[in-house]
Structure formats: structure tokens, C-alpha cells
Curated annotation (Swiss-Prot):
Species whose genome carries this gene: Agrobacterium fabrum (strain C58 / ATCC 33970) (Agrobacterium tumefaciens (strain C58))
Stated family: Belongs to the DNA polymerase type-C family. DnaE2 subfamily.
Superkingdom classification of source: Bacteria
Name of the featured protein: Error-prone DNA polymerase 2
Region (Disordered): 1040-1066
UniProt xrefs under HAMAP family: DNApol_error_prone (MF_01902)
Record gene name: dnaE2-2
Protein's job: DNA polymerase involved in damage-induced mutagenesis and translesion synthesis (TLS). It is not the major replicative DNA polymerase.
Record's subcellular location: Cytoplasm
UniProt xrefs under NCBIfam families: polc, PRK05672.1
Top class in the EC scheme: transferase
Principal subcellular localization: cytoplasm
Any single biological process term in GO: DNA replication
Matching InterPro entries: DNA_pol3_alpha_NTPase_dom, DNA_pol3_finger, DnaE2, DnaE2/DnaE/PolC, DNAPol_HHH, NA-bd_OB_tRNA, PHP_dom, Pol/His_phosphatase_N
């Protein structure tokens, strides 16, 4: 018997379905089901995933949606043609616009207005008067396209209920059709289905009651079983295929039209693009286009004409032109930097005359995929660009892509644990022991937490959390991926309001958009561009120099000397500990060295075993040999090692005779070979082509294995070059203007890898004077103050460093102060009219000390004497006299002041940093008594020496390709130390590694040149030692930068992972690995 299941809910219904489209379609194929109708509730968010599953399994997808109306009526709708699909997407858009984020409000009148061309299937409850009224309405609205669902509920009166619904349907001439209301692909998912129901209703399994599914039959059944269950309703069974035949629409029919751009009068898009290219060329090449660049430009323009991509280039050009007209720093990156056309138009900054670009990496005729140009803007001004796009293209034709927020380990543990009723402390203990997003918790670790792994609920929590990981939780908004259309965008996909004001998103993410070959424009935010813009402003204001990205001195010797010393904290791309480890070995001296540096600390070159050969050849320890001059021409700059994606493509083209398009297909197949195995079809062509061109079979095989190893992670050279430009500029500013760099970096927070405490500490080491927050001198941003008798400047910390202080309150303080400093707390309160809460925040940040000489407790005592607001009589007098008039005189009180240690903790608590002593300095006597030496002494010890040191934990890194090895950075008053923890020790001391604010390490020094590590043998938690600093029973909280993935969350699927940290800064960054397990190559100096 043939059967199609028309009522299938995937997990893209968000906490309703418990299986993915892939699982459902694969199961359907195994069971012999001919078609699947996906009907997620009020949403088409998962329909493209269903299309991809349909393509993979060759099971027909029927596009549909379940509409839950405000009057309680539920309806399955299926568009029969392309026009009906557009009406469905507009209908959902209408409901989302009323309901807002994660809600959809639709009425029956809306359905009537948009129902033409749709099949409607009523989902009835009981065969009562309400059901009869609903049948009458659906018959009138849908005519012969009206059906009613027959679905078992596993109740005693099931057969009677079906019989009565069938009779009612006959009375209103509505046809019946069998559905199974599928929520999961196989019976084993029933438990997870109950759990997601509990999560959705914010309740526990003990209290969920009848909200959970009342039976376990909501899984896919084979046609034979459906025939047995509905033996009395053979016609209704047959109608499942009838509906499939009537629904001729397929998502493959969606044809995307790019918007027509504002073009040169009388010219089409291609002619306009060429006009702008030749018009802009003199700006880039005042002395005329070099012949090789001219040839490249003509080749690119021909390919753009063939692919009809001119409107896309014009769009990006217009966006960049708008940003520059507003003084917003921006720069294109990614594969687009391979384009000479993009360079001439000012979209990217990589000069094709000095860099060997490969346009096929960007646009390829064989690949037939839309181009993807990523443009970075200052992160604090990107919203101006976004709103300009909405204004220019209108909200009918422009929206951001969605991102799918998925469950990760911690979020899954928390939600499943709550649903199963575990105590909060148990949930917290479990989740705090999780490192990676998919990590399992061994029984031994559970016992270390004083929990019983044999407890049924605990075991079930871990089992179901594993099943929940990766499941969608809700939709968020893409950082800046815009989809723009010629016609209405909601003809293609439903649109919903974003959480942020004046933004809207489509229901599909970037992968869905790519699957349907839509073009998107990426308007991305880059914090370092904000930092650079603010740095240029400060240099202009205080140094009298006009600097920007285009006129910074190139190849500056002092800048490269600083980079070679790995003195790059806070700079762009080469600031991480892994990058710092490579810098003393690679020793960059030119811009191209910096390009290599950016790209080499990635999993790709490491997995392809390219890092060590490159370094050995660079150091002269290994000869550089090229079998042919052609290969030397391709790999000469990288010493015979294919470090970049473009290198791999050029090797295939030059050595094996691949076309540009074939080489790009090779790159893409390598990127997915672990999942598709598609690379094998290229291996024979590559190896045989190289042998044919005179290379030995052994060399050809070695070349292929190298490319295969790094293909999935290889970095485009053009992308590395774009990033290297900003990396160089940031290092130049840090080298020559360290005071400016510190202030600009603090004013651009949150961004980057490091917390303000590390940024300020590094600036002080570079001789920058940093002054505390002051109620009479600080502004919102950090500023520069000239040092008396010198041409140097000090950095004055701004009010932005004070935690909890509102921008509006800070603005009122600055405006009231003008050129007349506040004389007292009372004076400040009256003249600024800020609430006392703002004064308390400033007092806790010690902002009254620098100018008013009030210690924390004195300032707080003075604030206690203030009213909620000044009395009108005194306020009027103060305004008339232009000075504060006290309401009453407070007697002087001698308060006991805080200890130095207590002040340090208060500094960290309220400003995130301290200008006093390092916290560990207060513990040095006790540590020395335990034979614990300073970090600097440990890092200067000879190779092989056993040392015992301790410090605050700043960074934890566990690179994905490091096979479980963890790298930890600690710090004391003498500087940082770099710790290596082997997997066995990590598992034994997991709670210490993941939970310590301060850690002691006993281990052996490993040294190779300037690269030094302490390989841990024993780990001890010294967090309790920090408690005594403030003479109180609260833990010390070390502020963490945004790179802190363990404490802040990893930008991962479950946004609720981002809880306030009670542990120090840790992170998980898979792309920061250098030498797999050869730890001598890492340097955290």
C-alpha cells in the first residue's frame, strides 16, 4: 500500500517536535513512505532543511504549515502552486508582525483572504458543535480544497470519534484524510518530546500534567501499520497521495531576483558597473592601470557579465560609498579580496598589483553560486549602515538572515535538569563541569561532585541532554547578512520583527539562503575598526596628525620589532596566546610575513602538517626544493608549502591541468570530504594530471594528502591579507601611540580578546600613565590628559568603566560640571540632578578620591545624608546663586577605611580593573612560605627544572585539534606564566581546572628558544586564599574579556549559557592550535 504522512512536525517548531528533518526523511525512506508533509506551527523556518533532507533521500517534500488561529481553530495548509506559496508566506508574515518575536496572531478572516490556491486540512478536536462550525467555515473558504484530518488519540472512544467526525465531514461535503500528527521519528524519542514540552511550559515532568502528549504513538509508522489502524477509512488513506499530487509546488521553483540598482542614467547594471570601475581606477592607480591589473579587471568584468552579478557589485559599492561619506571606517574581506574590481571600487584593500589574486576563489562559472562579499564596519556605527539599507531598499524588500540558536551542553543540562526536577545546585554542579558543547560527563566526574551516577533522574538528565544538544531553541538575528530582493521579500520567505528596534529578519539562516542560491550582502561589525577610528580621532585631537588606514607608514621597522617580540596584547588577530607563541618563531619582517602569521595559526595548516615544514624552511633548517619551475612560481612565496586555499587551487591548475572552476570545486569538496567523501573523484584527476606533467607519483600523492588534510580549514590568502592590513595598523598605533591605543581600545569595549584589566596593565608596562575615574575630570569615554612639563599624555579612565552607571547620568554630570568642578558630593548632587544610585556607583568605583579626596566609605557616608531629590526651595536658591546651598550641615565622622586588599577587590568589582597593587602581591609572603615562586622566575627557569608557581587564572584554551590538551595562562604581580595540562591530569583535576580563580601548579619547564611552558604535574585550587584580601567571606571575581568562552558562553546556540561568571576567564577556540601535541611551539610569554 502507498501512503504519505502529511502532518509531520520537525524540531524547527521550537520545543514541539523532537526530531530533525534528516531523521524524519531517512526513517520515512526506510519505512517506504512516499512523501512527507512538513507542517511546523506558524512557521516555515525548517522547510529548507526539509528540502535538503528530501534531496538526500529522494522522498517527496510537501511544503506546508500548521496555522493555530486566535479562536482555537487549527488548520494545516499546503500551497498547490508558486502563487499560493507566496500567499502563505505573506499570511505568516502578517501574523508575525502582529505577534512580535516568537509569536503569531492570525484570525479566520486572514486565512480567507489568503486561502486561494491552498489546500486546507482541519485539525479537529471533538465531533461537537464547534467542530461542525469549523467544518462549515473551511468548506465555504476552501471548497474542493477542504479536508478534515482523521487522527487516532489512543482513547477508549477513538473509533466512535473518527466515525462521528467522518459523518460530520460528509454532511458539509468535506473530504477526510488520514494523518498521524508525527512529532518524532521513532518511539525512543518520546521521553525527549515530554522534556521539550516541559521546557516550553516552564514546568517539571511531575507537574506538566495533560500538557504532555497522552500517548507515545506520535512517531512515523509504515504504510502497512497505517492501513491496519485505519482499515475502515481506505478512501481517507488514499487521499494522502491525492493531496501530494495536487500540491505541485516545490521550493525548487523559487526564483530569486536581485534588486535593480540605482544606475547611471541610460545604462544597464553591467554598463553602470563598468562606468564606476573606470571612474574609480585613477583613485587607486593615479599613474594608470598596470597592464596585468587591466587584464585582470577585464577578465573579471566579462565573468560578472556572464553570471549577471553586476547589480550585486553595485549594491555593495553603494553601501561602502554611503559609509565612507559618513566617515564610517569599513573594509571588505574574505574571498572578495581576490577581486581587482572590488579593490578599484574601494570595497576591499588588497592591491592586485602587489598580491597574486585568484578571482575563481570568489566567483566561478562552474560553481554557479552567488558571490559573497563580507564588509566590516565600525561596530558602534554599523547600525547607521543597517538603517540606511532599510531606508534605501524599504522593509518590503530587505531583511536580515536569521541565526538558529541551538542547544549546547550547558544549556541542555540546565533545561533538561529543570524539567526533570533536579535541584538547582545539582544542575549548576553538572553544567559547571562541562567544557565543550558536546562533551559527555563520565561517571567518575559525577562522583567527584558528590553525586550518584546511578540515580535514575540524574542518568536520564545526561542521556536526554545528549539528545537535545544541537536542537534548535529559537531564531536570532544574523550579525549582518542582508537578503535584498527586486520584488517583495515576503513572497519568498516569512518575515518577523527582530528583538532589536527597527530591524526585521527572515525565517531562514545563511545556510538556507545559500541552499536556495539567494544572494546576501554581509554588513558585519568589527570592533577593531571602531578602535582604529577612535584612535585616529585622538591622534588628530591631541597629536595634531592626520592618520587613517590608507596613510599609515608601511613596513615600519619599529612596529615589526614589537611584533617579533610578541608584544601584541590588544591588537588585531595576532593577540591570542597561540599567535604570540608563533611570532618569535616566524619573526615577521614584511607585510606578507604578517599575512602568513594570520593564516598559519589555524587548524587547516596544522592538520595538513604544513606549519613545521614552513618554519624549518624559514629558519634554514630544511632545504626548499621545487620539482619544476611552475611549482616554484605557485609556492615560492610560501617556501613550497601550500598554506592557503588559493595555493591549493593554483597547484591543481598549474600542476594537474585543472580549470579555475574545477580547482574551486576541489577546494569545496575538500572542505566537506569528511561528510560526503566527494574528494575521491578529484584525487585521480589530480594525481594523474601531476604525473602526466612530469611529477613523480610519490610527490603527487604527498601533495594530495597535504591538500586533503588542510582543505576543510584552509584560510583564503585574500582573507588573511585583509586581516593583516588591520593587524599591522593596530600594531603601528600601539607601537608609536601606546597611550592613544589604550584609550581607544577601552572606548571600544566590549570587543577583542582581553578584559580592561589586562589592557590597562599592558599599557602601564609600556610606560603609559593611567589615571583613575574622577568625578571632576572623567568624561564618558577614556580621554588623554597632557602630563605637566612633558609632551606626553596620560590616559584618564572614563565613566564607561563604572559598572552600572547609565550613559544619561554620566552625560548630566559632565554637562553640569562644565568648567566649574564640583566642590562636594552635595554640590555634585544638586547641580547634576542625578539620582543617588548613580552617586553610589561612582563612590563604589572610588571616583570621589582623585579630586575631592573622599575615600570610598567617606563618599558613601556623604551620599547617605542626601534626600531622594533636593528640596525645591534650596534647588531654586542654588540655581539663582549658581552654587550649592546645603540644606543641613553634617558633623564630621571619622570612619574606619578599607584595607588595601579590600580596595583592590572593590576596584575589580566596580570598574573591572585596579591601578593599585596586583591581588597576588598581597599574598606573596604566604606563597613564599610555601615555596611558591613568582611567575616571572618560573618562566626564566632553565629547561627541565621543576618549579612551583601560582597566579590568577586568565585564560583557559582547549583547542579542538589538541587531542584534549589544555593551555592555561596564569598571572601574578610579575607577569604571566603559560601552563600545559595533559588530558589525564585534566580529567583527574577537572574541578580545579574549571573552577579555580587562583591556581598553583607544580611541574617541569619546557623551553625552546623564546618559547617557554610549564608542563603541569599537579594542580591546586588557591581561590580560598583570595577571600582574605577583603577580610570577608566572598570570593574574588576576576573580570573576563569577551574571549572568555567558558565564563561568558561561546556565542553558541543557547544564549542562556551567558551567565555572570564566578570563575576566571577561559575560552574554547578551535582555531588557535599550533602544533597539535608538540607543546614546545606555544609561547605565552
Amino acid at each position: 500500500m502507498s501512503y504519505a504522512e502529511l502532518q509531520v512536525t520537525t524540531h524547527f517548531s521550537f520545543l514541539r517536535g523532537a526530531s530533525s528533518a534528516q531523521e524524519l526523511f531517512e526513517t520515512a525512506k526506510a519505512l517506504g513512505i512516499q512523501a512527507i508533509g512538513v507542517v511546523d506551527r506558524n512557521s516555515l523556518a525548517g522547510i529548507v532543511r526539509a528540502l535538503e533532507a528530501s534531496r538526500a533521500t529522494d522522498i517527496r517534500l510537501v511544503v506546508g504549515c500548521r496555522l493555530d488561529l486566535t479562536d482555537g481553530m487549527s488548520l494545516l495548509v499546503y500551497p498547490t502552486d508558486r502563487a499560493a506559496y507566496s500567499r502563505l508566506t505573506r499570511l505568516i508574515t502578517l501574523g508575525k508582525s502582529r505577534g512580535g518575536k516568537n509569536n503569531c496572531i492570525l484570525h479566520w478572516d486572514d486565512v480567507i483572504a489568503y486561502s486561494r490556491g491552498m489546500i486546507g486540512v482541519l485539525v479537529p478536536d471533538l465531533p461537537d458543535a464547534t467542530c461542525a462550525a469549523q467544518l462549515r467555515r473551511i468548506a465555504e473558504a476552501f471548497g474542493d480544497r477542504a479536508y478534515v484530518s482523521l487522527c487516532l488519540r489512543r482513547r477508549q472512544n477513538d473509533q466512535m470519534r473518527l466515525h462521528e467526525i467522518s459523518n460530520l465531514a460528509a454532511r458539509f461535503k468535506v473530504k477526510t484524510v488520514v494523518t498521524n500528527d508525527v512529532l518524532f521519528h521513532e518511539p525512543g524519542r518520546r521521553q525527549l518530546q515530554d522534556i521539550v514540552t516541559c521546557i516550553r511550559h516552564n514546568t517539571t515532568i511531575d507537574d506538566v500534567g495533560f500538557e504532555r502528549e497522552r500517548h507515545a504513538d506520535r512517531y512515523l509508522k509504515p504504510p502497512e501499520e497505517m492501513e491496519r489502524l485505519f482499515s475502515r477509512y481506505s478512501e481517507a488513506l488514499a487521499r494522502t497521495l491525492e493531496i501530494v499530487r495536487r500540491c505541485k509546488f516545490s521550493l525548487e521553483e523559487l526564483t530569486y531576483q536581485y534588486p535593480e540598482e540605482a544606475i547611471v542614467p541610460g545604462k544597464d547594471a553591467q554598463a553602470s558597473l563598468e562606468h564606476y570601475v573606470w571612474e574609480c581606477a585613477p583613485d587607486r592607480y593615479p599613474e594608470g592601470l598596470p597592464q596585468d591589473v587591466l587584464k585582470t579587471v577585464r577578465h573579471e568584468l566579462d565573468l560578472i557579465r556572464t553570471m549577471k552579478y553586476a547589480p550585486y557589485f553595485l549594491t555593495v559599492f553603494s553601501i561602502v560609498r554611503f559609509a565612507r561619506s559618513q566617515g564610517i571606517l569599513c573594509q571588505g574581506r574574505g574571498s572578495a579580496a581576490n577581486s581587482a574590481v572590488c579593490y578599484i571600487l574601494g570595497i576591499t584593500s588588497i592591491d592586485p598589483s602587489t598580491n597574486d589574486l585568484l578571482f575563481e576563489r570568489f566567483v566561478s562559472q562552474e560553481r554557479d553560486e552567488p558571490p559573497d562579499i563580507d564588509v566590516d564596519f565600525e561596530h558602534e556605527r554599523r547600525e547607521e549602515v543597517i538603517q540606511w539599507i532599510y531606508k534605501t531598499y524599504t522593509k518590503d524588500k530587505a531583511a536580515l538572515c536569521a541565526t538558529v540558536t541551538r542547544y549546547r551542553a550547558k544549556g541542555a543540562i540546565r533545561d533538561v535538569g529543570k524539567a526533570l526536577g533536579l535541584p538547582e545546585d545539582v544542575i549548576k554542579a553538572l553544567s559547571s563541569g562541562m567544557w565543550s558543547w558536546s562533551e559527555e560527563v563520565p561517571d567518575r566526574n559525577i562522583r567527584e561532585l558528590n553525586l550518584n551516577p546511578d540515580d535514575r533522574r540524574l542518568a536520564l538528565t545526561l542521556k536526554l541532554a545528549q539528545q537535545l544538544m544541537g536542537a534548535p531553541r529559537h531564531l536570532g538575528q544574523h550579525p549582518g547578512g542582508f537578503v535584498l530582493t527586486h520584488d517583495r521579500l515576503d513572497d519568498l520567505v516569512p518575515i518577523e520583527p527582530a528583538t532589536m528596534k527597527d530591524r526585521q529578519i527572515i525565517e531562514w539562516d545563511k545556510d538556507d539562503v545559500e541552499a536556495l542560491k539567494f544572494m546576501k550582502v554581509d554588513v558585519l561589525a568589527l570592533g577593531m575598526l571602531t578602535c582604529m577610528a577612535k584612535a585616529f580621532d585622538l591622534i588628530r585631537e591631541h597629536k595634531g596628525q592626520q592618520l587613517d588606514l590608507s596613510n599609515i607608514e608601511q613596513e615600519d621597522a619599529a612596529t615589526y620589532a614589537m611584533i617579533r617580540k610578541a608584544d601584541t596584547l590588544g591588537t588585531f588577530q595576532i593577540e591570542s596566546r597561540a599567535q604570540m607563541a608563533m611570532l618569535p618563531r616566524l619573526k615577521p619582517r614584511t607585510f606578507y610575513d604578517l599575512v602568513v602569521q594570520v593564516a598559519i595559526v589555524r587548524p587547516g595548516p596544522i592538520q595538513g602538517d604544513m606549519v613545521h615544514p614552513y618554519l624549518r624552511r624559514r629558519e634554514g633548517k630544511e632545504p626548499v626544493e621545487y620539482p619544476t619551475p611552475e611549482l616554484e612560481a605557485v609556492l615560492g612565496k610560501t617556501l613550497g608549502v601550500p598554506l592557503f586555499q588559493e595555493s591549493a587551487m593554483r597547484v591543481a591548475m598549474v600542476c594537474a591541468g585543472f580549470t579555475g572552476g574545477e580547482a574551486d570545486q576541489l577546494r569545496k569538496s575538500m572542505a566537506t570530504f569528511k561528510f560526503t567523501g566527494g574528494v575521491s573523484r578529484f584525487k585521480d584527476k589530480l594525481v594523474s594530471g601531476m604525473v602526466k606533467n612530469g611529477y613523480s607519483p610519490e610527490f603527487a600523492e604527498k601533495t594530495f594528502s597535504q591538500l586533503e588534510g588542510f582543505g576543510s580549514y584552509g584560510f583564503p590568502e585574500s582573507h588573511a591579507a585583509s586581516f593583516a592590513l588591520i593587524a599591522y595598523a593596530s600594531n603601528y598605533i600601539k607601537c608609536h601611540y601606546p597611550d592613544v591605543f589604550c584609550a581607544a581600545l577601552l572606548n571600544s569595549q566590549p570587543m577583542g580578546f582581553y578584559a580592561p584589566a589586562q589592557i590597562v596593565g599592558d599599557a602601564i608596562k609600556h610606560g603609559v600613565e593611567v589615571r583613575p575615574v574622577c568625578v571632576n575630570r572623567s568624561r564618558w569615554d577614556c580621554t588623554l590628559e597632557r602630563i605637566e612639563g612633558s609632551d606626553r599624555h596620560a590616559v584618564r579612565l572614563g565613566f564607561r568603566q563604572v559598572k552600572g552607571l547609565a550613559v544619561a547620568d554620566a552625560a548630566r554630570i559632565v554637562a553640569a560640571r562644565m568648567n566649574n568642578p564640583f566642590a562636594s558630593v552635595d554640590d555634585m548632587w544638586r547641580r547634576s540632578s542625578v539620582p543617588t544610585e548613580a552617586l553610589v556607583q561612582l563612590a563604589e568605583a572610588d571616583a570621589f578620591l582623585p579630586s575631592l579626596k573622599l575615600e570610598r566609605r567617606d563618599a558613601l557616608w556623604a551620599i547617605k545624608a542626601l534626600r531622594d531629590e533636593p528640596l525645591p526651595l534650596f534647588a531654586a536658591a542654588a540655581e539663582r546663586e549658581a552654587t550649592a546651598i546645603a540644606e543641613q550641615q553634617e558633623p564630621e565622622v571619622a570612619l574606619r577605611q578599607m584595607t588595601d586588599g579590600h580596595n583592590v577587590i572593590e576596584d575589580y568589582s566596580h570598574t573591572g580593573l585596579t591601578l593599585r597593587q596586583h591581588p597576588v602581591a598581597f599574598l606573596r609572603r604566604d606563597l613564599s612560605a610555601r615555596n611558591i615562586i613568582p611567575c616571572a622566575e618560573a618562566m626564566n627557569a632553565r629547561d627541565g627544572r621543576w618549579v612551583y608557581t601560582a597566579g590568577l587564572v586568565l585564560v583557559r584554551q582547549k583547542p579542538g585539534s589538541a587531542k584534549g590538551v589544555m593551555f592555561i595562562t596564569i598571572e601574578d604581580e610579575t607577569g604571566p606564566a603559560n601552563i600545559v595540562v595533559w588530558p589525564s591530569l585534566f580529567e583527574k583535576r577537572r574541578s580545579v581546572v574549571l573552577g579555580s580563580s587562583m591556581m598553583a601548579i607544580n611541574g617541569r619547564i619546557q623551553r625552546e628558544g623564546e618559547v617557554v611552558h610549564l608542563v603541569a604535574q599537579q594542580l591546586f585550587d588557591l581561590s580560598a586564599d583570595l577571600v582574605g584580601l577583603a577580610d570577608r567571606d566572598t570570593g574574588f571575581r576576576l573580570p573576563a574579556g569577551r574571549g572568555d568562552e567558558f565564563a561568558h558562553g561561546g556565542g553558541g546556540p543557547d544564549s542562556r549559557d551567558r551567565q555572570k561568571p564566578v570563575v576566571p576567564r577561559d575560552m574554547f577556540t578551535p582555531d588557535l592550535h599550533i602544533d597539535t601535541l608538540k607543546i614546545k611551539s606555544r609561547n605565552f610569554q
